Regions:
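Conserved DEDDh/DEDDy metal-dependent 3′-5′ exonuclease domain
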Residues: 57-174
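DnaQ-like (DEDDh/DEDDy) 3′-5′ exonuclease domain used for proofreading
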Residues: 1-98, 132
Length: 175
């Protein structure tokens, strides 16, 4: 158990953030993959465990104006409609600034590499350093999944835990 590593000391109070991204769909090309993130991120939802806040940041769907989209979410706390993907990514980076741990479902194989790639494409490679601590860049790493080699990023100084992998590892299943 992890708490045994603290040698009878109280475990630190970590700021844990869970997040999930949604990506636009291209009817001609289909869903984009982290290796080729050609479609924009349209929304990011985060749960900040330390403040018990659920936050959603989104760009308006193509069928609504900015004002119509903002009006449609006015009754939802902590739901923010921004004009562009760049604003969405900048807001996301600001929200996770205090997070010690970042987690999501299938985040190693999708959300982390897709988000880092979109930040580098839409904002700048330098801005992707905000995913890490100490102004260090995310470290590209290859891993194997379902017999295929895929790429993800390690977030230097910030712990990343893929909740899907944790679930698979620690959930009892009869074999």
């Amino acid at each position: 158990c992890l708490e045994e590593n603290y040698l009878d000391r109280e475990a630190p109070n970590m700021h844990v953030a869970f997040f999930d991204i949604e990506v636009d769909f291209d009817p001609a090309r289909g869903f984009s993959k982290p290796a080729d993130p050609f479609m924009p991120i349209t929304s990011i939802t985060l749960y900040l465990q330390w403040s018990e806040q659920l936050i959603t940041i989104a760009v308006p769907p193509k069928t609504l104006t900015l004002e119509e989209a903002q009006d449609s979410v006015k009754d939802f706390d902590n739901t923010y409609i921004v004009e562009t993907e760049a604003q969405l990514l900048e807001t996301f980076l600001g929200v996770i600034e205090d997070a010690d741990v970042l987690s999501g479902w299938n985040s190693e194989g999708y959300d982390i590499p897709y988000t880092v790639s979109r930040i580098q494409k839409v904002l700048s490679k330098d801005d992707s350093r905000k995913m890490c601590l100490w102004n260090l860049p995310p470290r590209k790493r290859k891993f194997e999944r379902f017999g295929n080699e895929e790429v993800t990023y390690d977030l230097i100084g910030r712990v990343h835990l893929d909740y899907m992998q944790l679930y698979r590892k620690y959930t009892y299943e009869e074999r």
